[in-house]
């Protein structure tokens, strides 16, 4: 993909694909190419790929204390791999994905997530291959908060939560949320409004 984005004509044959004189129809507006990031959970494979090609890293797989340790170790692997391949990676291009829902009060936030959090937990237990909430847990919201896997509360709680993520990882460039439909659409829009009005400005030094 990277040679194509650089405008090169690519002919390549592997055991799972073959391209002959392939080229992209539209060149990248962003130079040298569109920004790219490699997903990375617990395994270092994503970190190795990001470092090898000098790309951003997208850390998924939770934000428990144990997960943050894995994320930090994977970033170190990414940096070391980049150096070994004469590439450059930057923490500003490191994204950490988590779960959150905030409201004007903690009580309201907890009430809001009753709309869909248990269905979310059931989906990851019964359909997806990685249960986020164990089968023997009867209160998903409580479990996720107790294990630092989600923030359900107020803007102040979100600020403290993100600061904990920053400390646990050693620092990253972008905070990302999984769109999980825990709350109905009106409450979800209010969550986004509170994040943009109070939480984001805190980290940009604007409030």
Question: Which ranges hold each PLM region?
Answer:
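Active-site-adjacent structural elements that line small-molecule/cofactor binding pockets in enzymes
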Residues: 1-207
